[in-house]
Amino acid sequence: MKKMTLIALAAAAAAIMIGLVLHDTVAKKDKAIYVAVNGDDRSAGTKTKPFRTLNKAAAEAKAGTTVYIRKGTYHEQLVVKHSGTKLKPITFRAYKKAKVIISGKNQKDVEGDRSLITINNKNYLTIRGLKVQDLTTGLSDATVMGIYVSGSSSHITLEYNQVHRIKTLADDGNGHGIALYGTGKMKDINILNNTVEDLKLGYSESIVLNGNIDGFKVENNLVRRNDNIGIDLIGYEGTSNDKKVDFVRNGVVKKNRVYEISSFGNPAYGEEYSAAGIYVDGGKNIAIEKNTVYQSDIGIEATSEHPEKYAENIIITNNIIYHNFFTGISIGGYDEKRGGTKNSFISQNIMYRNDTKGIEGGQLLLQHDISNNVIEKNILTAGPSRIFIANYFTTNKENKLLKNVFHEEKGKKGIWVWKEKEYTSFSKFKKASKSDEKSSYVDPEYKNPNKKDFRLKRDSPVKTIAN
C-alpha cells in the first residue's frame, strides 16, 4: 500500500507541475498592444512601434489583450470590437499614469446615439484610466454619452476614468456621462473610482444603469456639477427585450461622493429642484450605503415613476446627507399617478439641514404609495423650514418608525407632517405615526457639524441607538 501511495503522490505532483507549466505558457501568450499619437497603423502595435489609432487597436485586441494607450489627445471614438473571456479578459487602459484624452470636439453633430467609448454585446472588458470629454449636441433627437455599454454586455469594469463636459444644448435633449442599457441581460457590472463632472444632461442622467441588469457595483465615484440626476438605477422604461426583467437589481451603490446635482436651470426642467444625487427608479434589491450627498436637489430617492410599479427591497444605510435643496431622503411617488416604495429599509443615516430652499421637503420626504418600510436609527437635524418629516399623502401604510433621533435645538421648533397633518409636538407626532418609545427628540451631540464631522461625542445620549 505504501508503494502505491508513493506512486500516486508522484503522479499527482507531476500533474500539478504540468498544469503550472501549461498555465505559464498560456499566460505568456497574453498580448500587449500599444497606441500612440505619433504611431502608425501599419506598424506592429508594439511598445517601440505603436499603432496610431484606437480603431486599429480595437480591431486587433482579441481575448487576452491589454491595450496600452500613450499620452495624448485622440480625436476619435473607441468602439470595442471583441470580447474577452473569464481567463483572458481584454483591457483598454492608459499606459502607466499617462494623460490620455478621448475627445469629441471634432465629431459631427448628427441625430441618434453618439458616444466616445462604445461597448455593445461584449464581455470581460475593462476600461481604465482614460479621460473622456467634450462631446456636444444641439439636436433634440440626439443622445450624447461619454461611455455607452449596451445589449447583453457582461463582466464589464469601468474604473479610474474621468468623464467631462458631455453636453446637450437642446431644450429637450439627452446626454449621459456613463450609460449602461441592458436590452439583453447584463451582469457583473462594475463602475469604480470614476469622476463624472460638468455635464449638461437634459432629461438624462450622469451615471445610469437601465433595464435588464442583474448584479452590479457603483463604488467610490465622484459625481459633481451636473444638471440632472447623479447616479440612477432604472426599471420599467421598456429598455429590456424581456419585459419581465426590465429593471436593475441586485447591486450596491457605495462610498460615492455626489454634490452640486441640480435640475434648476436645466432647460428640460426650468426652475424645478428635482434631481437626486442617487436615485432608484423601479430598481430592486439594491444597497445604498456609506455615500455622501450634498448641495443637490434631493440627497437619495427611491420610488418608481410608473404606476403600480415599485422600488423594492432598497436598503439605504449609513449615508451622510446634508445641505440639499429640497429634501434629504425621499421615498414614494411624487404624485398619485406614479408608483411607490415598499419592503425597504432606511437606517443609520445622517440627514442634516436639508430643505435649504424652503420647499418643505424636510429631512425625510414620504410620498405616494409607500408600504412595509422600516425607518430606524436615523438622526435628523432640521433645516430652515424646521420640517423633520414631510408626509403629504395618506397612501402610507404598514411603515415602521423605530429609534429615530430628531435633533432638539434650543429656541427652535420642530415640525412633523404625517398623513397631511402638521404637528409641532413631538409626543403627538410620535403617537400619530406610531413611532416606538425609543424614538427621541434630543441633541445628538455631533463632534463638529460645522466642519461636517457628524461623529457623535463620547457622551452623546443617542450613541447606543445610532450604533
Kindly give the residue locations of the regions a language model identified.
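Short glycine/acidic-rich loop motifs that flank beta-strands on beta-rich extracellular proteins
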Residues: 74-80, 104-107, 111-116, 136-145, ...
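Right-handed parallel beta-helix/beta-solenoid
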Residues: 23-55, 71, 96-99, 444-451
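Acidic Gly/Asp/Thr-rich repetitive segments characteristic of extracellular carbohydrate-active
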Residues: 37-75, 109, 429, 460-464
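Right-handed parallel beta-helix
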Residues: 89, 95-99, 123-134, 154-167, ...
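Extracellular beta-strand-rich solenoid/capping regions of secreted or surface-exposed proteins
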Residues: 55, 59-63, 75-91, 101-128, ...
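Short, contiguous acidic/charged loop-to-helix segments that flank catalytic cores in large enzymes
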Residues: 303-308, 332-340, 363-369, 389-395
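Sec-dependent N-terminal signal peptides of Gram-positive bacterial secreted proteins and lipoproteins
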Residues: 5-20
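Acidic, glycine- and Ser/Thr-rich low-complexity intrinsically disordered tracts
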Residues: 41, 65, 111, 343, ...
